[in-house]
Amino acid sequence: MKNNLKITIINAILIIFFLISNTYSIEQFNFDITEIEITDNGNKFKGLKRGSATSDSGLKIEADTFEYDKITNILNAYGDVKINDPINDYILFTNDITYIKNKETIFTKGITKAIIESKYNFLSKNVTFYRNKKELHSSEFSEVKDEKLTQYNLSEFNYSIEQGILKGSNIEVISDYSKNSKNRDLYTYKDGIFNLKTKKYNASDTKIYLKNNTFGKNNSLVSVNLESEENLSTNENAPRIYGASSSKKDEITVINKGIFTSCGFNDGCPPWSIKAEKITHNENKKQITYDNAFLNIYNLPVLYFPKFFHPDPTVKRQSGLLMPQINDSDILGTSILIPYFHVISENKDLTVTPTIFDTHIKMLQTEYRQKNKSSNFIVDAAHVQGYKSNLSQNKNGISHLFAKYDLDLNLPNFENSILNLKVEKVTNDTYLKIFDTNLIDKEIKPNNDGGLSSNLNFQFNNQTSDFTTGVSVNETLNGTNSDRYQYILPYYNYNTVLGYNEFGQFNFSSSGYNNLHNTNSLQTSLNNDLNFLSRDFFTKMGFQNNFGIYFKNLNTIGKNYSNYKSSPQSEIMSLYNFETNYPLIKKEENYINYIKPKLSIRLNPGEMKNYSNSSRSINSDNIFSIDRLSVGGDSFEEGRSLTAGINYTKENINDINKYFSIDLASVYRDKDLNKAPNNSGIRTKSSNLFGSVDFSLLDDYLLEYDFSLDNNFNNIEYNNVGVTFKKNNFLTKFNFIEENGKIGQSNSVANVTEYKFNENNYVYFGTRRNRETSLTEYYDLIYEYKNDCLSANIKYKKTYYQDRDLTPDEQIFFSITLFPLTTLEQKVNPDLYR
């Protein structure tokens, strides 16, 4: 009885002790687990088979297994651990933690992920979390991503949740991790302190690698890592900024003792760089400013700027001064252009460029641009004061006006409906040649410095037809003032496919114009063409045949024009053409041989207009063309003719670029065609023999030869010989052209030679000599050094022709291009080499 009482008392004491101990545990953690083990007299608890433990501060820990020591107040959790603090808005994921409750410190082992304030994602390992201080720390490589797609890679870090301050070493910052490495910027720092909330930072040993297309090039971003730059590309443009330290506050980033270059990585110094005491980037103004800056060429300072600025790479357009340009000319002297660019609105801008010459000439050039949804307008005008022409005793003002306007009309039922307007006007005939280097906008500058063209043009087309109409005014910049203009107003061209079937295709075209030229010579033409072109059909013997039927209705009237009468005329013309060829092929071990004899029989029962005073070059390439005399607008080639030709080609089976080809062709007719152009070579019953030879069977040689042999086979009236030799880095081309007899009277030889020393250096030489006059027309000698970001060359030019204000000249130019900054060209003083 006494023993039973003792046992009962002992059990009661144990139960009371357990209840007291369990109450203490609950004060620290509230366990919600599937299975629990209690050992060591109730001091140790082990939770099994997944569950959670919630602290008295509301921290909830989920895990597969828990171990809690009541005496030390340390909680261990293992297996798919999740720590969630909904009050302070952070979540941690790992597989192994130790939670020292008395110190409110959590240690993780292995890979650890954290989501802070629902916008900062941490990926690290072996992390220490100080709950009271709200700080995360790790000495392992870590990755941090924010809601703005910025990624921070650090060899170690410390992060204050409350302040949003991230501290670390060997830091790599990626501007937009959602993009691939080709399209994002990269920043590296030795040490740094970053405020993730305000984006302020202070860092040492700064290196900024911009994506390669930052300045318009489409090269890919080279790979960069924290340990070395061994994998960096050595032959691509790689814009970057290095600095001793950097900081950012209130949208202002400052790089101290900075160096900027866009050159690719190499073993030595970059070809060019800008070294500044301070580089400041103002994100509000989108502007980069350099203080006390030196422009270095291969580490040699060549220019000093107390201060200069330019728009940052995000800016497509920003008002401000553009890079000056220096020019030199024997006629105009030395000049400097100082462009100022002004943004009027999102789609409008203005560039004003004053140019100052040391010869008291002044030039002001203005360009206005406007781009709308369906149109684009650009106008460039300039006025020059103080220039004295050799043809005038006075210093007169001269000017130019160039304009271009394109409008998409977006008319229904048309795939394209476009209006184009172009205006070209100068007040001095040699203006385009003399002021060539001073004209800024090359987009609307006339392509031909000997003539101008202004026009208004409409274009419409769909799947089966196209229509063009407009007016045009052309001016040649030589000759008398009265005869230099040509007015074509209006003109039109219409083409359509009427239909097609298994036999061929019907086409219709119509064109017309009024052409006033040579002061009072007027021609008006309305031309309608209907033709049928058959499909190719083959005979059982292997002949390939086709035919064409061409009808033309020509309506004309003229004044002081020999081919048109002064009263309205209407004519109907026709041309019939039959072509046949017999293609043959023979295969050898290494070559394929092709032979194709070809015949064209054509008949025009009517007459053609007189084109004997015009010019037309016939060769083996165009002799089978229906309009081989280029008279299709007004006539068909008159009479009956047979054109016979043959082509032989020998082609390498393994390399189609290695071949030998020869073409021969001639025209035979029943009577002379005196209305054909005098130099055509097909006026007589038996025409010249036209031929061409191409020889490219050898690795290093290419021979191209065109010729025209008179019908008696006595004289070669046309020779055009081109020989190209290429061996490794050496290339030379010789071209000889000779015209005799009916073809013309000229004789010239030209040479172009290039030698590429390596990928960065080459030399070029070009010359042409007129053997008819025994005069050399020009010499060009150029040496160029070029890499991904710098191009420097020396040009020697010598010309022997004279054109009013232009005189024979000898010049040496030195130019250097620093991508993406500017191009500078300077003429070398003649006293230095004469």
Which residues does each predicted region cover?
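A generic signature of intrinsically disordered, low-complexity regions enriched in glycine/proline
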Residues: 7-8, 15, 61, 68, ...
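Outer-membrane beta-barrel proteins and related beta-barrel translocases across Gram-negative bacteria
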Residues: 197-210, 215-261, 267-268, 273-274, ...
